[in-house]
């Protein structure tokens, strides 16, 4: 029999001294107590039965008490179980190993791992031999509390003492390691199992494959999949779903469908999740015909589409502006007795809002109420954002009032939309008021919020205030992103602070944020307009040498600078160069060149470019 003497010192060395088990310190964990009528009724009956059993003389066997405690745990009444255990002990009933395992489980669910190990010490003190359930529960508790290294240490010590954990134990530890992103530790643990009495199973492999796919290491996931096949471990539908999802995330639909065909050949039936993953991937690529065809295939296989299947398709149609088809699909799901949920309505309301069809969007909001579907904070945010983008701030305030009336607290997204909307309609005072009132309402502005403010202030030529907010971000340990930097660079350039803009661009790089083509185009434009054409030409050449994929806007900025200087030879060379790189001139390119040529009385050349512009379909005659 293995010795557990080390665990007594393990407990003391790993955790602080344990106070006596008490529920007083746990009452704040009210989230663990469900409040539905059904749960309340079950809870009341279970407690009453437990108390009746305690009054019996002699009391019934302990396993009867264990059954009641287990049923309460299933309904997440962890505090009740702890309280009943105290009564249990005070009435002189001796707990068995199962009782103490239940208690450990409760403390682990409440994130009180120290109390869980106190119970474990109690098990050892009573001379009970901890079983795989005891140890697995403690491993799970340590992982749940983020104590991954301690979970591994606990595992190593237990195994070193000769105690055999089971597949559930290892599955639990692997799952905890994966959730913590400890993929190297997982790989080491898997190798340790080779030659071990506990063999890796499909659950363990699938858990690791899921972790790798989540981290976009699909190649490594495929290698592990091949390894399990070689070892004679048959993949199941969950394994395939995980890999299919991984390939879809990477945009490799060909491999994803290849796995679907492999499933069919191996007589592993795809489930609704398999089809949903693939339909979602097709929808995101705009392949609606193939997505609809796949849904028909699942119906033929007697796999019923669920609300998520329909939401995927409705979302894809909405993003393509096919609102008629999206609405028809919602009607179809209702005919199939699949009730639309809040996400279905949010998808449709969002699509209508983006098309400016606010009347139809509000009609859907009313329909939600008729169907007893409560709008979420996201529903109201979608409406406020859409109204803000149309400059309808009075209506946006009405929606905000509706939101408050529904007892839904506005979040940072709500305030961001309001601030953005107020800047759009030039109501800077209102935008600033909303921003400064956020903290009083218990909402902390995020990076996007500061970016909206900085961008809005810069556009209103209030650059000093924008810089002040930028500095405030740093004092609050908030890291500006590329959009924040670019907004401020643009503001500085447009307000004739080019040197400060260049300095900020350098600082941006020092912070590990690489400026993009849009950021550089702003600086290039400022150099050209600031009469520093030679610097602009050098800078433009530097971008080409560095391999930046310049867009038509960047070329247009440089062409405009050259045209203003009358350097038409350079303009023609640059036009040829951009076409050679696959960047086609647009209407702005031609208009810039034509206007400059006419200004310099180069009428013949201007007319030649005008004919070319018409021939390319860039000007309607």
Regions found by a protein language model. Give the residues of each.
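Methionine-biased hydrophobic packing positions in alpha-helices, especially
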Residues: 53, 88, 123, 158, ...
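Helix-turn-helix repeat elements of alpha-solenoid scaffolds
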Residues: 31-46, 77-78
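N-terminal mitochondrial targeting presequence
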Residues: 1-35
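TPR/TPR-like (Sel1-like) alpha-helical repeat modules
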Residues: 598, 603, 607-618
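Pentatricopeptide repeat
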Residues: 46, 61-66, 81, 96-101, ...
């Amino acid at each position: 029999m293995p010795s557990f003497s080390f665990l007594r010192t393990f407990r003391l060395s790993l955790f602080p001294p344990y106070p006596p088990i008490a529920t007083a310190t746990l009452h704040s964990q009210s989230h663990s107590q469900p409040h539905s009528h059904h749960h309340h009724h079950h809870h009341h009956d279970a407690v009453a039965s437990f108390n009746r059993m305690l009054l019996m003389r002699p009391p019934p066997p302990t396993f009867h008490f264990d059954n009641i405690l287990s049923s309460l745990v299933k309904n997440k009444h962890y505090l009740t179980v702890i309280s009943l255990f105290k009564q249990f002990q005070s009435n002189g009933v001796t707990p068995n190993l199962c009782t103490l395992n239940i208690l450990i489980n409760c403390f682990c669910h409440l994130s009180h791992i120290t109390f869980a190990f106190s119970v474990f010490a109690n098990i050892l003190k009573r001379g009970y031999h901890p079983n795989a359930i005891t140890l697995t529960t403690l491993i799970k508790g340590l992982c749940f509390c983020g104590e991954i290294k301690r979970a591994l240490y606990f595992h190593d010590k237990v195994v070193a003492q000769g105690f055999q954990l089971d597949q559930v134990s290892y599955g639990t530890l692997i799952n905890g390691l994966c959730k913590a992103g400890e993929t190297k530790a997982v790989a080491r643990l898997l190798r340790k199992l080779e030659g071990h009495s506990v063999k890796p199973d499909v659950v363990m492999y699938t858990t690791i494959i899921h972790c790798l796919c989540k981290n976009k290491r699909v190649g490594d996931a495929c290698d592990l999949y091949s390894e399990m096949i070689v070892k004679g471990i048959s993949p199941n539908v969950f394994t395939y779903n995980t890999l299919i999802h991984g390939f879809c995330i990477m945009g490799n639909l060909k491999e994803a469908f290849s796995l679907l065909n492999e499933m069919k050949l191996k007589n592993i039936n795809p489930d609704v999740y398999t089809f949903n993953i693939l339909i979602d991937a097709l929808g995101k690529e705009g392949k609606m015909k193939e997505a609809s065809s796949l849904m028909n295939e699942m119906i033929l296989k007697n796999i019923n589409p669920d609300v998520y299947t329909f939401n995927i398709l409705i979302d894809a149609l909405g993003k393509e502006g096919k609102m008629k088809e999206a609405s028809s699909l919602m009607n179809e799901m209702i005919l199939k007795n699949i009730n639309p949920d809040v996400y279905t309505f949010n998808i449709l309301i969002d699509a209508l809002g983006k098309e400016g069809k606010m009347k139809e969007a509000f009609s859907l909001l009313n329909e939600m109420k008729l169907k007893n579907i409560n709008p979420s904070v996201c529903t109201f945010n979608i409406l406020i954002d859409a109204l803000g983008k149309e400059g309808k701030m009075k209506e946006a305030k009405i929606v905000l009032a509706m939101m408050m009336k529904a007892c839904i607290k506005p979040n940072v997204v709500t305030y961001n939309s309001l601030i953005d909307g107020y800047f759009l309609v030039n109501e800077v005072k209102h935008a600033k008021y909303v921003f400064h009132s956020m903290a009083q309402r218990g909402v902390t502005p995020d990076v996007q919020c500061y970016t909206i403010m900085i961008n809005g202030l810069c556009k209103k030529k209030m650059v000093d205030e924008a810089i002040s907010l930028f500095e405030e971000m740093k004092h609050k340990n908030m890291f500006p992103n590329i959009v924040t930097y670019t907004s401020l660079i643009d503001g500085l350039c447009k307000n004739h602070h080019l040197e400060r803009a260049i300095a900020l661009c350098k600082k941006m790089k020092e912070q590990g944020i690489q400026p993009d083509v849009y950021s550089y185009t702003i600086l290039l434009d400022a150099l050209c307009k600031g009469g520093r054409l030679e610097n602009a030409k050098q800078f433009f050449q530097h971008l080409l040498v560095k391999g930046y994929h310049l867009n038509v806007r960047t070329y247009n900025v440089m062409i405009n600078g050259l045209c203003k200087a009358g350097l038409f030879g350079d303009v023609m060379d640059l036009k040829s160069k951009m076409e050679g790189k696959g960047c086609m001139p647009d209407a702005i390119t031609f208009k810039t060149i034509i206007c400059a040529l006419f200004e310099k009385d180069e009428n013949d050349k201007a007319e030649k470019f005008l004919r070319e512009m018409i021939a390319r379909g860039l000007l309607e005659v």
